[in-house]
Amino acid sequence: MILKEIAVYEETLNKHLPNETRMVLHYKNVEATENEDKITVRISNDLLVYKWVELGGVSKGTYKMKMTSLEDETSEVNVKIERIQMNSDRDLAVEIEFNVLNPFQSVVGVPGIHSFSIKG
């Protein structure tokens, strides 16, 4: 499916401040695939991923992912980064696979993400 927008946030805890939220990834018009408890995001050349390089590779922490469909339907899930596939020059990610920590239940009760009622 093609998503209108996808954003991934990292929540940090600070003793003196309430929870802070920092956006670590943001794309518009990106292709995403849902399969069981995984979301795979495929990135074209015009959607650069330098923010992941700044993070120093795969982080073991959890993130909050907000997805917006082309119909402006939104869904939010907690995810961990499962795998990042880089291009041949190793300077851009071309595919990022997320493991969903709180999968949705479909109408028929089959486990999986089933984020949006309208699939693109």
Swiss-Prot record:
- Species, as recorded: Bacillus subtilis (strain 168)
Gene this protein is translated from = yosG
Protein name as catalogued: SPbeta prophage-derived uncharacterized protein YosG
